[in-house]
Amino acid sequence: MAGVRLVVIYPRPADIDKFERDYIEQHLPMAAQKIPGKTKLVSAKVLGTASGDPAPFHRIAEVYFPSLQALQEAAGTQGAQATIAHAQAISTGGPPIFLVMEEAAPVPL
C-alpha cells in the first residue's frame, strides 16, 4: 500500500481569532510533537470557494504516514489521542471531519 494521510477538516469556527490563536500556538505544536511516526504535517487556511462564496470550512490539516499500519499505531498512542481531543475542543464551529486517504499514482501533466 502507498503512503496514507490523515486529513482533518475544521468547520468555520464561532470565533475565528480565538481558533487561530489556539490552533497556531497550541494545536500545531502539539501535533508536531505528540503524533509519532508521521513523515509530514501540512496545514492550510481555506480562503473561500472557487465562486468567491464563504467556505463552510476554515482549516485543513494533513498528517502523512508511510503506511496505514503506521497511522493506526500512531492513533493508538496517548499523544495522538490528546491531539485528537484538543482538535475537537478547539473546533467551535462543529466537530472536525477526520478522513484517511491513500495516496494514488501521480497524474502526468
Segments the model singles out, each with a brief description of its role:
Residues 1-109:
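Macromolecular interaction modules
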